[in-house]
C-alpha cells in the first residue's frame, strides 16, 4: 500500500552505511567550509542564461564525451540486467527512476566540478560519469534498505485477512 502509488520510488533516501559504530575523534571540518560551499552554490546560481525572443531560457546542451557515453551505456546495460531479473515491481520502478536520475547527477556533478575549476562545461566527461555511477549506486542501496525495512513491517496476506475480519472496535480482555 505504502509504495503502490509510485510516490516512494521518487524519493532519494540517504541511509548511513555504518558497518561499525562511529568512533569519537578530534577531526573538525575546516572553519571556512561553509563559506566555500556557499561560494560554489552562489557561482552556479549567478550563471547568466541566454533568453530567446519570447524571454524564455535557451537551453545549453552538454553532450557526453565518447568514453563517458560508453561507460554510461555499460552501466545502464548492467542495470537493465538487474531490472530484468527483479520480480518486485516496486524495486523495478526504483531502478527505472534511477536511470533517469543518473543523467541529472552527471549534469550536476559536471557543473559543480566546473564551478570548482576542475573542468570545463562544454561536455560531460568520464570522471563525472564515474562519480554519478557511485552516487546512483549509493541511492540504489539506500532504496533497497528502505524497501527491506518497509517489507519487514508489512503484514502477510493471512495476517491482513485476519485484521480485515476484526470488528471496528473490540477489547483484548
Locate predicted features.
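Phosphate-handling catalytic cores of nucleic-acid transaction enzymes
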Residues: 1-173
Amino acid at each position: 500500500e505504502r509504495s503502490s502509488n509510485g510516490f516512494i520510488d521518487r524519493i532519494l533516501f540517504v541511509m548511513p552505511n555504518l558497518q561499525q559504530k562511529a568512533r569519537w575523534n578530534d577531526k573538525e571540518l575546516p572553519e571556512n567550509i561553509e563559506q566555500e560551499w556557499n561560494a560554489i552554490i552562489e557561482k552556479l546560481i549567478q550563471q547568466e542564461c541566454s533568453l530567446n525572443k519570447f524571454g524564455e531560457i535557451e537551453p545549453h546542451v552538454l553532450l557526453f564525451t565518447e568514453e563517458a557515453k560508453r561507460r554510461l551505456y555499460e552501466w545502464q546495460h548492467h542495470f537493465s540486467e538487474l531490472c530484468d531479473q527483479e520480480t518486485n515491481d516496486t524495486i523495478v520502478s526504483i531502478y527505472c527512476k534511477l536511470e533517469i536520475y543518473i543523467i541529472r547527477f552527471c549534469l550536476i556533478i559536471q557543473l559543480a566540478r566546473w564551478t570548482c575549476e576542475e573542468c570545463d562545461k562544454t561536455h560531460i566527461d568520464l570522471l563525472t560519469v564515474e562519480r554519478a555511477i557511485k552516487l546512483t549506486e549509493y541511492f540504489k542501496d539506500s532504496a533497497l534498505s528502505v524497501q527491506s525495512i518497509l517489507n519487514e513491517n508489512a503484514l502477510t496476506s493471512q495476517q491482513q485477512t485476519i485484521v480485515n475480519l476484526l470488528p471496528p472496535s473490540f477489547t483484548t480482555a
